[in-house]
From Swiss-Prot:
Lineage, highest ranks first: Eukaryota, Fungi, Dikarya, Ascomycota, Pezizomycotina
Gene name in the database record: srb8
Pfam families linked: ARM_SRB8 (PF25326), Med12 (PF09497)
Organism, scientific name: Aspergillus oryzae (strain ATCC 42149 / RIB 40) (Yellow koji mold)
Name of the protein described by the UniProt record: Mediator of RNA polymerase II transcription subunit 12
Record keyword Cytoplasm present: no
Record keywords: Activator, Nucleus, Repressor, Transcription, Transcription regulation
Subcellular location: Nucleus
Subunit structure: Component of the srb8-11 complex, which itself associates with the Mediator complex.
Amino acid sequence: MIPHSSAGVQSWGHPLRAVNNGSGHVDASQAVGPPDPQFEKLPTPVPQPQPRQPAVIDLTTSGGDAQELEPPPKRLRLDLPAAPSARDASPAPGSGGELRSTPGTGGSKPPSLSWRNRPVWSFQAMLSEVPGSNVMNEEDATAVAQGGKPASPPSLPVLPWKYIPESLGSNPTTSRASSPVKEVQTIPYRIETPSVAPVLKGEKVADFSPWIGNHPEDVLNEQTAKQGHYDRTQVSQNESNTARPSLYAQLKHRSGLQMLSSVFAAALEKRQNHSLVTAPSTFKPPPRVTLTDNKREAWLRDLANPSVPLRKLSRTIPHGIRGKALLDQCLNKGIPVNRAVWLAKCVGANEIRAFKRKGTSGTLALGLEAKWVRDWTASVQQFLEGVLGACGSAQWKMKMTYAVSLTARLFFERLLDHDQYLGWFLSSLEAAPVNIVPVWLLMLGIYWDNIMRYRKRGRRLAELLLVKLRQVTQPDKGGPLQPLVDRLSLYVRRLVLEHTSSVVLPGSWENHKELISSCLNLKDNVHKTIYQNLSERNSRLQLPKNHQDTAERSPQQRVIQLFDSIRSAHDISSASTACLKTIEDKAILISKLLEWTATPFRYGLCRVYTGVRLLRKWKMSGIDVDSYILSFLADVRVTSALNMENIYHIISELVRSQTFSVGRYLQWLMAKGVTNTPQPVPSDLCLLKQLPANRLPEHVRNLRNTLLYRAGIPVMEEDSAIAELKISIAQRLPNIFGAEMDSAMPTESSQPHPTWAVKSEIGQWIRHGIAGHCRDSPRYVYLLSRSTAPANNYRKLSGVSVAVDPGASALTPDEFYSVREILETFGDLSMLADILKQATRCDDDVVLASVADTVNCHFDCFCVIGATADLFRGLVESYARLKRLGNASLDLLFSLIELGLRIPSEFNTVALLRQDLTRLENKSALAAPSPLSDSIPLALSDVDPSFQEKLNQLLSSGGGMDESTMDTVFYSLMHILENSGSPAKLSANETARYLAYLRPFQPKHFDTMLIRWICGLLKSSTPSMSRILPPLIGVGCVTIHAFVFLVKKLLQSEKVAAVIPNLAGLRVDLLQLLVPLVSGKSKYADLVTYRFHVAQQEFFMKHPQETLDIICDAVALVNSETGSNPGQPDIAGCATELLDILLTQNPEVTVQYCLQGFIGKHSTSTTVLERALDNLLGFDSLAGPPTMSEAEKVVRMTDDFSLPFCQLKLQMLFNAESGRNVGNGIVDVMFKAAVEDTRSKGSNWVGFVGLMSQDIIRQVWKHHYHYKNLEAHGHPGTAKSLETAKLYLTIIEKLAYSVPEAGVQSVAPILVEKMDLLLHRLVIMQTNFNNVTMNRHGAATTQILQSRSNFERSLAFWFSAFLRMIVIHRSAFTMPSPAPRANGLQEQSRLLISILCISLARLPDSVIRLFPAADYFPHPIPSQGYRPCPGILLQTHALDVAASLIDTFPDEARQQCARFLKEKCPPFLQYQNDSRFIYLLGPMSDAAALNSLQAASLPSPAAGGSTPTPTPSSALPGAPSNPQPTAMTPAVTSASLSEGINCVASHLRLQYRGRAMGPYPVRPWELLEDAAPIVGVNDTAVNLKYFDARRVRA
């Protein structure tokens, strides 16, 4: 038969409906028999919608193939609609009605429905897995290319009883183009029987007789023309009488009917016996013969010719064609696919039968057969790789289509080792380069169902598709890959929507979840729900890696984190909105804000102004801020550790801006009242004397004074304090306040800590005085007229004052330093910002540089206030004004650049300033040396009284300077700096400024001399680096980080370190260099000292770890150095002060470093750190050794602010030398704290446990492992026991991150035993319940039923709890232990068996399937705008846990579990062939099949039984102790190597009364068509007598 070129191929994924043969029943011959891999290609008499296009491989389209039309039989009640062909590789999930197949049936091919009763396995059609796989001849291809259609004979007329006439308006005409296209044959035309012709017995067709010229019907004469042609029936005249008389007498008799029945029964029995096939199977594969090369080629050419029957070719199959050579011959000769498969079967059957003929045993023959099939599969793989590797060659598309079709046909004919082939396919897809991936994706559509049948392959496919998608979506990939991206996205989408369980990826979900979400349409509710469900399932299998993931931050902790972030982000608006969203209760929010501003565990004034800005914003948004502040003041305790000065500062700022209602506060205070007791004054009353009164209305001020008097606080003290401070300040600044205070007596302030009422009044008074201190003011003109001293001693260094603007500020550097020191001492930075704004109008470059340094020092505060940008703009304008006059200095430029670098929006301005700085330096460096410098080296000396004058003359001459002159000046200045005193009377700061002005003349030479001088200074033992370096750091010649780096490099070299005489002194100098100066020593006296202070702050913020290293190195010298010299600096005190700053500036980072590298490094460092912590926590470290009460006190005082410090303190107590008793006690304290905090729904214990060492965490964790003590025969279902267990399990969940990666090996056997115990209890409960249902009576039954219901809920809780423990300790089951356990594989198998049996048990209340994980699991924090689905059933989660274990377990554990479920399944598990079992446990390996299946080559199935293979769960409670022998069924090894329609069902068959209930496995290699020249009675590969088959007679 010539296959029709336009006939479509029926999809394998959809079964055809049964055919009605007209008599109302389905023909059995059409339903019985092995499945056909492809339908016959039959010509269709009706026009098709589209002709078949030329064969192409297109990766961007997914058009379906035209399906073969069937004759319209009578429609049955269940009829599936037509669906697109499954051969299309498009993975679109919504493609027309695609069915989700179940394992065992999803990938099967439909039975062949032959309309002529042909053998069910037809080989006349090619397997076409790709669109357009049929090959057209040249003429048709040319016709199609030219736009025409290939010629075809006219269609047969439609039979009148099959179709009704079409309506007139439907399609009156049918064009020739729409007629079916047929290939032009190269052999003589042969009549083809229409597919719609009625079929009779014996391959006869009714009413079809093609014209041949000699039929009576073809003879045209007068009679046939008039009457037509008809067949006359020959009526026999032999029967003259009827049988009625003879039969009537017999039927009339009483026993006649019985006799008639016996006769008919005997007739039917005879008929049945004679019709049965009783002859033994005479099937033999076609023999092979030895042929010459020419004959072999001729035979292959005949095989390629479809007109040569296979029965003829089966007589002379040549030797020597096998393996890859066979496939290459089929490809090169163009042998049709079905005939190529026939040849492969013939060769394979002979090869396999040869093993038995060699006299080998059955087991050995099975092994040899399995090996041969694997080798044959490898040959097919090499064949496909070879064709794929020839990409780009001539006719590659045709060859590739043929190779894909042939290999797919071999695969679905079960002629390959499925496991090996699909594993190779996935490995090839994974290793394929991007340009070859489309071809593999095309083939993926063919094997999709077989790959997704088992998790072992489905998970691997999901991961490699995601990896490929991530690879092609890299930013460097261009637009040409977009079709490939779309195709991969479609596959991923299909995976998620149709095979969700294969996308449960515990190990890689975090890496791929964003990519998966991008492939879905999350606006679609279906996609969104599935993705949320998948995300929740994966999150249940995740193990937290650190405590941040486990410890879910409370709203209060998140708000504190937002407060802390403002210091670096400076975004008040966003932080304000985020805070309001985080905590809805405004009272809690404002209370937490005020605590944050006043806590001793934070540093700096920035938090004060942050609180002010936030409160102002919230006030403007309508929040009653005043009430919440007053409530906080009423609730705060007098003994609280809060710094109430900051609270009063905030309220004072709010009063200044008229945000806080003073009148309302006074009314509230009067209504509240105060107690007349000698106790400390409460905070709400202390606020009364802190309120600024200068801007209050008169009546409010009077009321305030009255309340002060009633409270016993004299009002005159405030007035006298203000007066004293004004007099003191006026004496320091006579040019500003001299006229007002000329008559005042010199005095000092008697109040070291003035109230904010006093500070606010003084601040406004100073601001008013600075505003009036201008060059055109009468006071300044009068003072200038009385002054006789020159304005500047050294104009180059102190600045140039040029009165270009009469309204410019007349501030001098000393006046500015004094004002700045006063306001910084007060902490009134908002008033300082106003004064700095006025100072920017000054024309003194030193004052302007000091203003810039001040803004840089308080940068965070001024950013929060909002004054930084205006101040920087004003400074730049003043610099531009001085630049136009030619009076800009290096000091101002340096300060502006340092400030501008911290303002992101001013980078362009900084670039211009750097250009000016470079221009000034180049101007000095490129200038020619002046004649004055020739005589300077001889005369210039630091002992010369006129040294400063000569130096000024040299630096201001405008000329250059050669290296010798610079050397002389440099070493002279350094000599002054080292001696700290000389006849020149230059201070260290002035000397450093001269050095800064000297550097631009020769920058490189200056830096070289400076490094050489510092190295020489390190080798000497006399000078102190902490005294010499600050001035150099202040002027910018040296940086702290550069000096620390230099010292580290020098100390790393042993030769250099040996030269340095005093290493201990150097480490101490480094520590003293970082310690801020104490107040009272005029620390901000001038420009240089202030800049050094700014440099210290910058080093603390940018290099905290290096600072801690310096402290640790210095305090290690305390034991050997202290006490020997009274002048020795207090190293421990300096270190403690510095540690306090570092701990409060960045608590989390500093505490983490102290835990890792500071504690235990040296005993002295631990002591110093303990002293610093005691200062912060308020402990007295001198009270004695650590005690348990101290540890309990630390735990009790833990809150959101002190948490890091309490962690550090507890760790130090745990590591204390006093011993292990204290250490164990600390663990006990932390254990109790964890239990109490968890019971009260708190989470602080997670925080202070989180940062501690792993030893402490594991000890606390072991304390909570009480689930190990679950008694075997107790009743754990009580409410109290469940609550306690839930409490401990929650703590274990929080500490899960402490489990090491290698796992805790001792936990694995315990969990296995607990799961076995749980299964044992389940079996006992089920047995008891079955007994109760059989003997149901009275109240006892009701009580037992209630007990059973309670037990089921308890079972669900413990099952979910143990599942979580298994997830946490998953690595303990897979990681190799130091001492390998002999029963490790058995533990893995037993664990899988327990999980699967419990999860799929059919309990009366269905609690396992409906109970959502016992409401135990903590849900992750909502992210990406949605909340994960909380309704994941416990059964689903249990199967996910089993899947995650199977992913990591060896195949042996999976196979042992499968054998147990097949042979020893518990009695309440009645469905071993559950699709979920098959999905998780498949596929079976060769060894498992060999152990459980009989040799295929045996002539008949064995009737005897054998003892089943013992499994690790043979002693499992509930399993039968003496299982029934397993009946073995005939099978073949290739049945285990392939996965046909019944393969999985045959692996997991139901064992019932010693018999294996399952399908009869067939031998695919022997399913041969036309195997022998002469057809015998039982010439089939399957022995028909085993099935009571009957002969079909024509």
